[in-house]
Amino acid sequence: MKLHNITLKGLALGVLFVASSCSDDFLDTKPDGLIDADDVNATMQKDPSLVQSYLTGAYMNFYNGGEWRTSHDIYGIQGLRIALDMMTDDVTLPRNAQWFSFDYQLDNRMSSYRRTTATWRELYQVINDANTVIEFLKPADDSEPEGDVRKMLGQAYALRALNYYYLINMWQQPYSVNPDAPGVPVKTESEYRPERVPVKEVYDQIISDITTAYSYLEGQNITDKSSISEYAAAFIYANVLMFTGDYAGAAEWAEKAIKGGRLNSNADMLSGFNSLDMPEVLWGYKVDTENTSYYGSFFSHVDTYMPGYGGQVGYRKLIASELYDQIADNDIRKKWFGYEEDYNLLEVDFSYEQGNGWLPYLSNKFRDKYLTSLGAEGPFTSDVIYMRVAEMYYVAAEAYYLNNQPEKAQEVMTAIMSTRVPGYTCTSTGDALYKEICVNKRIDMFEEGSRLFDIKRRNESIDRALSENAPIAQLDYINAVKYKGQDDKMIYMIPDAEIQNNPEITVQNP
């Protein structure tokens, strides 16, 4: 179905574009008046600030889920990333209750559940926002956009690519399993394919979008880390190519992304991961008292010492002992874990963990600004970090290894790990080198949402029984202890609401 024209209600443009980007009211089959699409496009080209609210809205909807935010565990991308991490072997939830417990039990994928329905809607909501920006700003004569138009278009294309990347990898098995498998519907600014578009064709759209995004963003010198830059676009590109098996390309794009930041110092590593000013950050969301989602927020669930769900409420997420045991004592990341009296300013009770011998597994990696500033900042106003250059070092190292360039993999590992472990030099070879890359990525990216996609891409065999702080008896009862990354339980089912309203979807996931 081609969308050749846009019809707009006969409102003054200056009023129309102040509206929130989460609305589709600009589409109207029976308008009071018509504005030609070319006229709209020309107006936007002259004054792209008229479209800024849509791009701003896209970023906000990505952060908090917009109108589809339904509860304290469904609040945009960071809620989803916690859910994805809970499906892995990195994190344990000893009490196996409260928010994210069904994700931990690998039992939150059914077509009627909140997780699948809200996530589907949240991701497509951002895609719709991006489509609106592209439709309004894309030059009608296919000329090269310039200035702010070029920057805004680049960001919109990158957002669209990223959201399709999440959709295709949560609703279908990895590209390598079957490129022809039914994927997800694809909407762009000019075309809507409501059927389950094959996996390869979804990836073709993603690669086309992220290629365009990077070409528009390159050299634009976007220094505001709450906006997607060329380095953030390269980050997306590298991860996409890891799934398609283009390891030479993945290494190349990861190296480009790495140029956008510098590795953390020891002080940075222990700062609480709560500010976009951290040197490794490429992209994130600036949170303040106006846009915080408070208890339904990332730091409410991951800060061990705050009055949130992961702190005073008591449903703490611990590092799996199997992973913790692989962190060297002289590794700065070891200090991300274990009870710290100086951090416990609100006197949170840890008697449950202490009684079970689990104090070493408490997480200190994420600490809210409210505590690190000693109350100078508001509660749960910590910035949310989406991308760090550290991840790209591990992506580059793995890509080099898989592309039969072990010396390059060693070089990249030495570069990042020497900032984590004093005097580190990577000399491992063969399988030991690959394990070193994968394990250190798990440690570095703890609770940052990357682990599940790695498990799926590699089809890893997971055994949660290797961690003594996991509630194995409860997990075993529901068959959530041992599994493989490409088991059916690792993909979501298409939401009932989508199937009921979209007759073109005729195949459901198992």
Where are the model-predicted features located?
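Hydrophobic-face positions in mid-chain alpha helices that act as interaction patches
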Residues: 191, 251-385, 389, 444, ...
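Sec-dependent bacterial lipoprotein signal peptides
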Residues: 1-20
